[in-house]
Amino acid sequence: MEKVTSIFFVLLLISSCLILRSQGQFRCKSVAECDSRGCRVGTHVICNEHHICTCAHGSPIGGQCDGVEDCDLSGCPPNSHVICDRIGGNFCTCVPN
């Protein structure tokens, strides 16, 4: 009986974790733990201050764009800025200042 109870508890714990993850409530420590497939074009995945994976405005560097307003403006190093490279195929990229 005790073994059955232990197995039931473990299965319950696993299923509750899967349900939380499927609802976007998966707790993360970094963006590498998040699944970006749920984000639309013009957004990028982040691990927010509450440690929950979510989508934020702006395509990441290398992501699709129609204009610079579609890009994540904080994605470049300090000595460069973001552009939407429409000549090279409509993607966000960094160029030196």
From Swiss-Prot:
Main subcellular localisation: secreted
Full protein name: Defensin-like protein 301
Organism per entry: Arabidopsis thaliana (Mouse-ear cress)
Protein family (similarity comment): Belongs to the DEFL family.
Entry keyword set: Antimicrobial, Disulfide bond, Fungicide, Plant defense, Secreted, Signal
Any single Gene Ontology cellular-component annotation: extracellular region
Signal peptide (UniProt feature, chain positions): 1-24
One of the protein's GO biological processes: defense response to fungus
SS bond list: 28-47, 34-53, 39-55, 65-84, 71-92, 76-94
Lineage: superkingdom: Eukaryota
Compartmental location: Secreted
